Regions:
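Active-site microenvironments that recognize anionic phosphate/pyrophosphate groups
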Residues: 1-228, 232-235, 309-311, 325-329, ...
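Secondary-structure-rich domain cores
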Residues: 209, 218-263
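Catalytic or ion-translocation cores adjacent to nucleophile or general acid/base/metal-coordination motifs
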Residues: 237, 241, 250-273, 279-340
Length: 503
């Protein structure tokens, strides 16, 4: 049970946190305290005189949440708690105009990097990016013939509690905001089936002469994982204009790469209804992968063109003039959209349904610009109903979900269930032996895989966890190879060249 004295101390600590992190200034101290007290239902606030330093946010918020639950201000469930603590943090988060003004001033007077450094820090300090949860994600690297692939088991998205699931089913449908990306999420109170965003701020940027918005992903799968979204709720579309938009962003923020999910189901991302790109300040394995074969395209002698040594099928274009990359990228995209090669099981369309598209990634590398074009095809078959160029069923025990932009570049985002399954698998391998895996209903899905790697690995209590992580990395490599439209063999290489010869 939380006493009034303790809750007053917690409010004071929160205000001191806001001051220390520059979310508020000294002149805002009383205003912010009163705003928090209003949310907490505190009428007789008696703050301690102490100025707290080095305040850790998560324990203070937890204390405030426990009090709110105790007083009936919030329900005791993960969704309700998230809605409530975001409301609290909204009291400390600067107004959008202040954030935008400071970002633009830093951009103008210092550098684009100084501006994004400020904005990224703010996004974490305001708890929009929940650092305490991100820290729980499991992360490791796996060495492969394609370089160092990154693996993360995503634990930062909270599992919905049964009460919240039931309440969401009963909730009235709402068309506001239209989706999780819309600009209207800024300051939104949220509801049982839509996250609160009182602590969310965006930065308007001009892209291709239009208003777009820069924000960070609340789940930060990699360093400074940002999202660039159209201010208008309009569908994803990969075309010449999209390539131009990518480079318009890179020109303004040369320290960031930017890419787009494909615009078709299966090979695209989870949100196809709102045009957006994803970028950040991170070196992916694909970006540093070497060129294994070069090509020449008539009329584009000034552009370096090559196939990237990567499990998926990637063309890299490089030139000091990005307009030339946009022009050639459009030519390749147009050709790929209509390209069929039955011998390689590439069909542009079946029954009028288009299958070919591209996942593009743009970056500045030294004085030159690069455009990576990842060839994609979303055809399905009876044997592969989730997609032929998609991880096949024997890999679904590790990765079944869409292979989007992040995975394409070499970072596996794996489901939270794997944490417990990895621990249970390690325990079974050491204490019961590999044959017991098939007898465990929770681990049976991993049996074929475990038997295969256990046959050639020396597994001990000291190395079992590293072995499992290493083998998951190998599965992810296969996942990417399955998603590649041209296979990594002589036949696939010949088919790749056939396509390039048509450009």
């Amino acid at each position: 049970m939380c006493s009034d004295k303790n809750i007053h101390i917690a409010v004071r600590k929160l205000v001191c946190y806001g001051l220390e992190k520059s979310l508020i200034s000294a002149e805002d101290r009383i205003y912010a305290a009163n705003a928090v007290c209003e949310v907490m239902g505190i009428e007789d606030y008696d703050p301690p005189a102490e100025n707290f330093t080095g305040v850790e946010l998560e324990p203070v918020l937890r204390e405030l949440l426990d009090y709110a639950v105790e007083k009936g201000l919030a329900e005791d469930g993960s969704v309700s708690r998230d809605l409530f603590d975001t409301k609290i943090m909204g009291c400390l988060t600067p107004r959008p105009s202040e954030v935008i003004e400071k970002f633009r001033r830093l951009y103008r007077e210092k550098s684009p990097e100084a501006a994004t450094d400020y904005y990224y820090k703010l996004s974490g300090d305001s708890n929009y990016i929940r650092r305490d949860r991100i820290a729980k994600d499991m992360k490791w690297t796996a060495q492969t013939e394609y370089g160092s692939l990154e693996i993360t088991v995503n634990l930062s998205k909270p599992e919905k509690d049964p009460k919240a699931i039931a309440a969401a089913l009963k909730a009235k449908p709402s068309g506001y905001p239209k989706c999780l990306l819309c600009e209207e999420n800024v300051g939104y109170a949220g509801r049982i089936n839509h996250p609160a965003r009182q602590n969310h701020r965006i930065i308007p940027v001009k892209i291709n002469g239009e208003r777009w918005c820069l924000q960070y992903s609340p789940y930060v799968y990699y360093n400074e994982h940002c999202i660039l979204l159209n201010s208008v709720h309009t569908p994803m579309k990969i075309d010449r204009a999209a390539f131009g938009k990518l480079f318009d962003f890179v020109e303004q923020f040369p320290h960031y790469f930017i890419g787009s999910n494909a615009d078709l189901p299966i090979v695209g991302g989870s949100i196809l209804t709102h045009e957006h790109f994803q970028g950040g300040h991170h070196d992916f394995a694909m970006a540093s992968a070497p060129i294994e074969e070069t090509y020449a395209v008539q009329g584009f002698e000034d552009v370096d063109i090559g196939r990237v040594k990567w499990p998926m099928s990637v063309l890299r274009l490089r030139c000091t003039d990005y307009e030339r990359l946009v022009e050639l990228g459009d030519k390749i995209l147009t050709k790929w959209r209509s390209y069929t090669d039955e011998s390689a099981f590439i069909f542009a369309e079946t029954d009028g349904v288009p299958h070919n598209t591209i996942t593009p990634i743009a970056r500045k590398n030294g004085n030159a610009y690069e455009l990576d074009l990842v060839l994609r095809n979303n055809i399905t078959t009876e044997e592969c109903p989730l997609g032929y160029f998609h991880p096949h069923s024997e890999l679904h025990h590790i990765k079944k979900e869409n292979i989007g932009l992040i995975e394409v570049m070499g970072l596996a985002v794996l489901p939270a269930r794997l944490k417990d399954e990895m621990e249970a698998l390690a325990d079974t391998l050491i204490n019961k032996g590999v044959n017991a895996v098939r007898l465990d209903p929770d681990l049976e899905k991993h049996a074929d895989w475990a038997e295969e790697f256990a046959a050639h690995r020396d597994i001990t209590p000291e190395n079992v966890n590293d072995v499992i992580k290493d083998e998951i990395g190998k599965v992810f490599m296969k996942v990417l190879e399955h998603a590649g439209v041209y296979k990594r063999n002589a036949k696939g290489a010949a088919a790749f060249r056939r396509f390039v010869s048509t450009i």
